[in-house]
């Protein structure tokens, strides 16, 4: 089509030039009206009108009939012929090539545009991996994405905060985000700039470890396999491990304890208990020995006083046991585990069923407090109790009977530690115990809760001192149970597989302990 257009334009231009030349040389023969034949444009005006008779020769091809008038076409000149031949040659050679090239480019662009639209509509399938006989899709990698930040972040933050103008705090936050690199750190080996940071983190982590606990393992405390063994031909999913969670202690723990126990202000016992759990390391002791540092640990143990050694092996030690330990000599052996197994015979640890209670023959009532039949330890209770002890390094002793009562509370419709019903649940247990039994059951927890000097004053003989001591020891027992139930409540919702059904967890306003991963 374009070639035909070019030919027509060339013909019109050539005819116009030739006609204009003839008009200048010869005066045209005028007709009846002395007018011109009207055509569209100026070309028609330049062609003269001639009135001719009809040609008698029907084969004469030199005339063009137009009604009663006819226009005579002069034979084309040589210049006209050469122009037509030249134009046609260009169109047939280079012109057609240019037209074909332009058409090909247009087709390529349209195909690319169509392909782009199609690729946008159809997502790219992620690669699959065969896991347990099933095809699983790999999740997208966040580090492949680019985080974009708006230029009007301060204004957006001000609008969301419902303030008129961006404050200094909002401007600083926006500036910090704009300069921050949100990309993940590469998984490869760290460079020299990050090596010091990693070393600092490792040093800070090691400060929170007990040096001797790294090498000491109790053969009776085995890690529970959290992966179900009954999963067949499926991708097994391990249950969450509580020891991977961080225990957070509230700053207002003394006031929360006073609120729970119906006190107006926190007592000395509540303040001491809050101080104990704030400084306590809830992480469980590592399992299994480390042969690389056994020798250094042995040398460290024998270079320290005996009282420090006892506190390394077990954080909860009876006062008279420490005195007896100081009179004995610990002989160096080839493995630190021997010292843990030997001391397990007379040093209590933060576990129960022979673990939380000293096994000394002089100690009475080593099986825990007396409870009702419904609160006695069963197979389920012992299983949950063992998992609870292995999940944390407990700040106080925990007996299976106490765990049984806590299980009954957590299975209720109202089980939140913020509810004061837990005090009523433990009331029959605490109020039944007398001073000698409380002293044995609380053990070294008494010194933590009451303080060494206060404990000496309370344990003096006399009826008045006896009543004051009984009241204080019962309060200490309530405080200990309140703290332990908060930790047990968090544990139960992490290990909900132990229970058939639990009510939804309550987001507590007032709390003492919480777990955060």
Curated annotation (Swiss-Prot):
Stretches with biased composition (Basic and acidic residues): 51-73
Location of the motif RxLR-dEER: 50-71
Keyword Secreted in record: yes
GO cellular component, one term: extracellular region
Source organism superkingdom: Eukaryota
Keyword annotations: Host cytoplasm, Host nucleus, Secreted, Signal, Virulence
The keyword RNA-binding is assigned to this record: no
Region named Disordered: 50-73, 351-376
Subcellular location, record wording: Secreted; Host nucleus; Host cytoplasm
Primary location class: secreted
Signal peptide: 1-21
Family classification: Belongs to the RxLR effector family.
Function: Secreted effector that acts as an elicitor that induces cell death in host plant cells.
Free-text comment about domains: The RxLR-dEER motif acts to carry the protein into the host cell cytoplasm through binding to cell surface phosphatidylinositol-3-phosphate.
The protein's name: Secreted RxLR effector protein 95
Upper lineage: Eukaryota, Sar, Stramenopiles, Oomycota, Peronosporales
Gene (name only): RXLR95
């Amino acid at each position: 089509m374009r070639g035909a257009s070019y030919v027509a334009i060339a013909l019109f231009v050539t005819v116009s030039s030739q006609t204009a030349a003839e008009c200048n040389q010869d005066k045209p023969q005028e007709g009846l009206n002395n007018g011109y034949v009207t055509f569209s444009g100026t070309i028609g005006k330049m062609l003269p009108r001639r009135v001719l008779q009809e040609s008698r020769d029907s084969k004469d091809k030199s005339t063009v009939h137009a009604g009663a008038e006819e226009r005579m076409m002069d034979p084309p000149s040589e210049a006209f012929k050469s122009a037509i031949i030249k134009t046609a040659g260009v169109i047939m050679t280079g012109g057609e090539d240019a037209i074909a090239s332009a058409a090909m480019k247009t087709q390529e662009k349209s195909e690319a545009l169509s392909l782009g639209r199609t690729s946008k509509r159809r997502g790219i399938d992620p690669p699959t991996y065969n896991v347990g006989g099933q095809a699983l899709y790999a999740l997208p990698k966040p580090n492949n994405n680019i985080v974009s930040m708006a230029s009007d972040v301060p204004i957006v933050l001000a609008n969301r905060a419902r303030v008129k103008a961006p404050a200094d705090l909002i401007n600083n936050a926006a500036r910090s985000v704009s300069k921050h690199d949100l990309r993940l750190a590469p998984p490869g080996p760290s460079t020299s700039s990050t090596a010091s940071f990693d070393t600092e983190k490792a040093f800070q982590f090691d400060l929170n470890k007990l040096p001797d606990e790294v090498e000491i393992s109790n053969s009776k405390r085995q890690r529970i396999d959290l992966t179900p063994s009954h999963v067949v031909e499926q991708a097994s999913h391990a249950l969450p491990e509580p020891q991977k969670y961080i225990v957070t202690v509230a700053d207002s723990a003394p006031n929360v304890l006073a609120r729970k126990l119906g006190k107006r202000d926190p007592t000395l016992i509540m303040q001491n208990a809050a101080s104990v759990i704030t400084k306590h390391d809830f992480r469980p002791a590592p399992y299994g020995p480390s042969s690389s540092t056994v020798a250094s640990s042995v040398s460290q143990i024998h270079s320290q006083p005996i009282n420090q050694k006892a506190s390394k092996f077990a954080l909860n030690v009876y006062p008279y046991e420490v005195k007896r330990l100081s009179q004995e000599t610990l002989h160096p052996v080839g493995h630190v585990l021997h010292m843990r197994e030997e001391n397990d015979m007379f040093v209590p640890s933060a576990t129960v069923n022979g673990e939380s209670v000293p096994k000394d023959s002089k100690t009475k009532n080593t099986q825990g407090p007396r409870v009702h039949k419904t609160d006695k330890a069963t197979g389920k209770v012992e299983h949950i109790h063992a998992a609870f002890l292995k999940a944390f390094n407990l700040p106080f002793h925990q007996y299976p009977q106490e765990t049984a009562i806590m299980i009954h509370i957590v299975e209720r419709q109202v089980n939140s530690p913020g509810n004061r019903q837990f005090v009523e649940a433990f009331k029959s247990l605490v109020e039944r115990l007398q001073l000698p039994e409380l002293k044995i059951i609380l053990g070294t927890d008494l010194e933590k809760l009451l303080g060494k000097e206060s404990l000496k004053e309370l344990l003096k003989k006399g009826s008045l001192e006896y009543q004051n001591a009984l009241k204080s020891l019962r309060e200490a027992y309530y405080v200990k149970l309140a703290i332990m139930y908060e930790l047990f409540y968090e544990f139960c919702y992490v290990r909900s597989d132990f229970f058939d059904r639990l009510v939804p967890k309550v987001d507590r306003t007032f709390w003492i302990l919480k777990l955060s991963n």
